């Protein structure tokens, strides 16, 4: 569906039809709002991602009632390896992680929004927009124009609406390199026989923390018959390595990781991965923008930086920020006021719901990168700690539990040796593990 009518007015213009934008459009359309859902791509389209959904996704009725549309597998076992390849092997009686493929998942979210009445304008990017006293005027790359009461930026890390808010609020115009994770991945069909034999009915999801000593992690997520394999690493680390090591590249790093998976038996030895099969993305992991609204403007999903700083998981935050944006607008449309102070209703909503989670997941990230072997060793000791570690990593652990557990571990002396090392500069020996 292409926009050819000039100056058509909508209640809300959503710039970006990924999970956050499509979800915002879905809920707004259900409310009876007129919605323009715009994206530069034509759907279905692929997106670089591990394709994992934490259990919080069960909050969305239109997701769990349509599992058959896109669900690939339910994960009931997670294995996390430390730098020394000691594993934390956690088995759950019920799924704690759901596997999808973004090609199908994102397309279905768009279809759900359109089915509720949203107008899809695909294959055309937003060129610019202007906020005035009574509307937002939007210009598209093909020359068409439209307007709305509010514009929602859902265009990812380099979103136009996000940049406008940053400019107004005197915030840095771009994410810092240390707040961007570069993710590379590929998907390959390994066949049902290999998948059932190696990854089992539990459809193991696996990660290698600080593979080859680099901050970040490598992963192998098992779908139905497809493996999703990738690596994620802060952009500043990648830039540093490229400048210091001649010939080093993130693609070579991923291919080296595949060889390790083959050696461990997690990847078929007879399948070769070509560099052309690899895709990448920049993921903001900086705990969210300090301000996510302006006059007649708001941002959702990656555009607002709503991604777990620990694992890079952003699908739940994408969907929930889209829903929270729609719920806030439903209140504001009854009053007809869309100034920044009115739209702060949305900013407060996401901040109070999971803003603390993002902050404590960042704490978890730093602990895991600074003292990975100690955390892995202690996490492997008992089932309760395994459960905590796994749920924290996949993003299903509330901030309060993360905070309380980490502080309790330090208070009990589990981590104090390495914490003291950081504080004093004196290397402390990690105590021997005891039952």
Model feature map: region roles:
Residues 42-80:
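N-terminal FAD cofactor-binding segment of flavoenzymes
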Residues 112-267:
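Predominantly flavin-linked oxidoreductase catalytic cores and closely associated redox partners
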Residues 128, 214, 235-237, 244-328, ...:
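FAD/FMN-dependent oxidoreductases across multiple families
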């Amino acid at each position: 569906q292409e926009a050819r009518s000039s100056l058509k007015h909508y209640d809300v213009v959503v710039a970006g039809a990924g999970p956050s934008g499509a979800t915002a459009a879905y809920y707004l359309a259900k409310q009876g709002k007129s919605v323009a859902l715009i994206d530069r791509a034509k759907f279905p389209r692929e997106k670089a991602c591990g394709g994992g959904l934490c259990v919080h996704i069960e909050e969305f009725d239109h997701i769990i009632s349509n599992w058959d549309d896109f669900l690939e597998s339910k994960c009931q076992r997670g294995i996390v390896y430390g730098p020394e390849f000691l594993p934390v092997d956690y088995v759950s009686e019920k799924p704690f992680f759901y596997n999808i493929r973004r090609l199908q998942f994102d397309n279905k979210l768009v279809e759900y929004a359109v089915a509720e009445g949203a107008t899809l304008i695909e294959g055309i990017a937003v060129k610019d927009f202007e906020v005035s006293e009574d509307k937002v005027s939007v210009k598209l790359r093909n020359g068409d124009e439209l307007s709305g009461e509010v514009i929602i930026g859902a265009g990812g890390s380099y979103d136009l609406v996000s940049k406008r808010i940053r400019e107004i609020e005197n915030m840095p115009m771009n994410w810092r390199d240390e707040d961007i994770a570069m993710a590379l991945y590929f998907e390959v069909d390994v066949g049902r026989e290999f998948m059932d034999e190696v990854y089992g009915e539990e459809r193991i999801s696996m990660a290698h923390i600080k593979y080859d000593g680099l901050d970040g992690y490598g992963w192998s997520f098992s779908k139905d018959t497809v493996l999703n394999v990738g690596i994620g690493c802060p952009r500043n680390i990648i830039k540093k390595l490229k400048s210091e090591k001649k010939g080093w590249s993130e693609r070579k790093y991923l291919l080296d990781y595949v060889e390790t998976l083959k050696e461990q038996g997690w990847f078929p030895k007879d399948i070769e991965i070509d560099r052309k099969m690899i895709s990448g993305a920049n993921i903001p992991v900086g705990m969210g923008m300090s301000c996510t609204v302006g006059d007649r403007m708001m941002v959702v999903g990656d555009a607002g930086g709503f991604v777990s700083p620990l694992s890079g998981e952003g699908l739940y935050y994408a969907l929930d920020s889209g829903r929270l944006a729609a719920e806030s607008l439903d209140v504001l449309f009854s009053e007809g006021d869309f100034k920044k102070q009115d739209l702060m209703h949305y900013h407060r909503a996401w901040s109070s719901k999971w803003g603390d989670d993002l902050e404590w997941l960042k704490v978890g990230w730093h602990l895991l990168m600074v003292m990975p072997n100690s955390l892995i060793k202690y996490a492997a000791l008992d089932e309760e700690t395994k459960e905590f570690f796994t749920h924290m990593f996949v993003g299903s652990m509330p901030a309060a539990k993360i905070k309380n557990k980490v502080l309790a571990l330090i208070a009990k002396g589990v981590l104090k040796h390495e914490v003291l090392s950081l504080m004093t500069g004196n290397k402390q020996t990690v105590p021997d593990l005891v039952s």
